[in-house]
């Protein structure tokens, strides 16, 4: 299961905060330009005696510097907005296991992990709380479903509890194949695409 399905609702919520930050940045940009125009006008008058050409050059220089400063500020605010949104995503990722839909997400992550290692005799690693969510009857149903899909005998044995936020880690019995579908690993793997999606949605 991709990070997009896990985080789309969170990105939507974070969008509200991002729009506020961007509005403030744009207001600050306008303030910088307005101040620069006023400064340029004052300096233009002060050096009018030196000639219109010098005055115009000074005005253009001040405005160019102001535009550069405003652009830099806007880029900084853009990156700040993306970072704040990512932090919000990470905060909500920690809360995801508490939500009603989490069990379905966990089951899909397990199925995806089993697919990626090819089935067979496997070790299932979860955090302590999730081992209570995936009881023996659920595990048996998963094994049966994967056998039907893969046309291969698949056995999921519970391993040790891991210190992960949620999700799962699937290993083959001989340890040669590992699928890390923990929530944090899934998020990290898709970080670049998540950043791109945030930028696309917000800007």
From Swiss-Prot:
First-listed, main subcellular location of the protein, grouped into a coarse class: membrane
Gene this chain is encoded by: atpE
UniProt membrane topology term: Peripheral membrane protein
Source organism, top-level taxon: Archaea
Claim: Membrane is one of the keywords in the record: yes
A GO biological process held by the record: proton motive force-driven plasma membrane ATP synthesis
Keyword check for Transport: yes
Name of the protein this chain belongs to: A-type ATP synthase subunit E
Function text: Component of the A-type ATP synthase that produces ATP from ADP in the presence of a proton gradient across the membrane.
Localization in the cell: Cell membrane
GO MF term list: ATP binding; proton-transporting ATP synthase activity, rotational mechanism; proton-transporting ATPase activity, rotational mechanism
HAMAP family xrefs: ATP_synth_E_arch
Protein family (similarity comment): Belongs to the V-ATPase E subunit family.
SUBUNIT field: Has multiple subunits with at least A(3), B(3), C, D, E, F, H, I and proteolipid K(x).
An annotated GO cellular component: proton-transporting two-sector ATPase complex, catalytic domain
Keyword field: ATP synthesis, Cell membrane, Hydrogen ion transport, Ion transport, Membrane, Transport
Coiled coil: none
């Amino acid at each position: 299961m991709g990070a997009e399905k896990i985080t789309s609702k969170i990105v939507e919520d974070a969008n509200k905060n991002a729009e506020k930050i961007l509005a403030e940045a744009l207001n600050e940009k306008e303030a910088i330009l307005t101040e620069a125009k006023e400064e340029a006008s004052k300096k233009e008058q002060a050096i009018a005696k030196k000639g219109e050409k010098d005055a115009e050059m000074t005005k253009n220089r001040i405005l160019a510097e102001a535009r550069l400063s405003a652009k830099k500020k806007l880029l900084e605010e853009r990156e700040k907005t993306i970072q704040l949104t990512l932090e919000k995503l990470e905060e909500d990722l920690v809360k995801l296991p508490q939500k009603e839909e989490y069990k379905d997400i966990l089951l899909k992550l397990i199925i995806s992990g089993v697919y990626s290692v090819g089935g067979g005799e496997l070790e299932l690693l979860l955090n302590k709380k999730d081992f209570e969510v995936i009881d023996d009857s659920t595990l048996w149903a998963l094994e049966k479903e994967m056998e039907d899909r893969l046309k291969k005998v698949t056995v999921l044995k519970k391993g040790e509890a891991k210190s992960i936020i949620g999700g799962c880690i699937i290993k083959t019995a001989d340890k040669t194949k590992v699928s890390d579908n923990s929530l944090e690993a899934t998020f990290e793997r898709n970080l670049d695409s998540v950043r791109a999606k945030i930028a696309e949605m917000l800007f």
